[in-house]
Amino acid sequence: MHHPRARYPPGYTSGGGGGGGGGGGGGRGNGGGGFGGGGGGGGGNHGYYGRGPQPQPQQQHYHHQAQQLHQHQQQQQHAQRNSSSQQQQWLRRDQATAAAASGEVAARTAAQLEAVDSSSEDWKAQLNLPAPDTRYRTEDVTATKGNEFEDYFLKRELLMGIYEKGFERPSPIQEESIPIALTGSDILARAKNGTGKTAAFCIPALEKIDPEKNAIQVVILVPTRELALQTSQVCKELGKYLNIQVMVSTGGTSLKDDIMRLYQPVHLLVGTPGRILDLTRKGICVLKDCSMLVMDEADKLLAPEFQPSIEQLIHFLPANRQLLMFSATFPVTVKDFKEKYLPRPYVINLMDELTLKGITQYYAFVEERQKVHCLNTLFSKLQINQSIIFCNSVNRVELLAKKITELGYSCFYIHAKMLQDHRNRVFHDFRNGACRNLVCTDLFTRGIDIQAVNVVINFDFPKTSETYLHRVGRSGRFGHLGLAVNLITYEDRFNLYRIEQELGTEIKTIPPQIDLAVYCQ
């Protein structure tokens, strides 16, 4: 059924073609550069091989004889057959060789053992692994202790999901938090944006859930609806072999739909604090069996608009609940909350410096009226996979998106005053590469992880170092390289100096030519 609506829904501007899935150019191309890093998917079992060459005729003869022997054994006494097959199956290769009296028996035992060996490794060989990510990575994610995911004794089904998601080995924050979370300890973790924090709590949460138990066992709280959708998607992908039911619940969506969904099994609930508290008070969302509460972007969740809801929500949890708090910044509000609800947490601090190592930061002094012209110059000179452009107000977001479209570049926009359905659609399409550029407010700074974004532009310079940190953290995700360009007016100059001092980082003057190696490897 056709619903009458404007030709271009909110968030979509009418100009420029939109940079197609992987590899297509968009609009006027933003100064070239293949889009989205080329074809990912496909490839099947990279780095893994099949079961080896076909057996030679001699081997086939042995296999045939082994089959005949096995059929002959089946006709013997029941107890004898059980004991002999059990014994033969678990003999090790060296024991089998010693025990074998004839070539036929040795071949039969070897064939059985080969089947046992392959079955123990088969699950890895049969995984549908994505193409390996060969881009350069910084120490933010490579400076690990050398652990593997298998070292944590996770369920095999969870390991399958981890590897198929493209995770190869744990990042530093994952190495620190996964084993501690599995012991049941409370955690207060501070790590940079884009270093794998989401998986650091999703993996232990999925490991601890019992799929046979029809109850909400883990709640993950996040500050924005977009982050809730993204986090739930990560949980679904990592846990796709676990038969765990994941639900998202946020404000701005139908309460009736959430109520109906909660009458079905739900093991893991991801959402914003207000909506989850509302459902809990109504008695629809029952948290008496919830053993783990995760707070992602904890500093934002403890802002005045969220903190009362969170404190009320904690009272619905059992006394022995586990609390995990993750954030890049921990202001005073977090310390007060910690003293009240986390008396003895395990503290993880991986913040020797605040900004990501892979992000190169520049500023350009401009007059307000020159900003659009300056942006046009950046588009023509930079090799942009995808860019996020930040403004300080909703009105300026829409105006700038219109200007960018008039310049001939593909552009979406997103802000908090849009309908939730429109926000979801813009977020989904931008993530899937339908467009090169996204103009937005600070709504989009928290935890949003889009790997193809290699350039962030602060069209309006932020007022606080915390906002700056979260904005530039949208590029250079998971140790890859990124570029942050700040357009600075005369009024912004003191803010620029102050933010440099607070973050202990250097924001350099933009050079006439930017080396591709600093943001495109």
From Swiss-Prot:
InterPro entries linked to this entry: DEAD/DEAH_box_helicase_dom, Helicase_ATP-bd, Helicase_C-like, P-loop_NTPase, RNA-helicase_DEAD-box_CS, RNA_helicase_DEAD_Q_motif
Localization: Cytoplasm, P-body
Reactions mediated catalytically: ATP + H2O = ADP + phosphate + H(+)
Motif, Q motif: chain positions: 147-175
Predominant subcellular localization, coarse grouping: cytoplasm
Region Disordered, residue ranges: 1-97
Helicase C-terminal domain sequence ranges: 358-518
Composition bias type Gly residues, residue spans: 13-50
Biased composition range(s): Low complexity: 51-89
Renumbered ranges of motif DEAD box: 296-299
GO cellular component: cytoplasmic stress granule; P-body
Keyword field: ATP-binding, Cytoplasm, Helicase, Hydrolase, mRNA processing, mRNA transport, Nucleotide-binding, RNA-binding, Translation regulation, Transport
EC number assigned by the record: 3.6.4.13
Domain notes: The Q motif is unique to and characteristic of the DEAD box family of RNA helicases and controls ATP binding and hydrolysis.
Family: Belongs to the DEAD box helicase family. DDX6/DHH1 subfamily.
Name of this protein: DEAD-box ATP-dependent RNA helicase 12
Organism: Oryza sativa subsp. japonica (Rice)
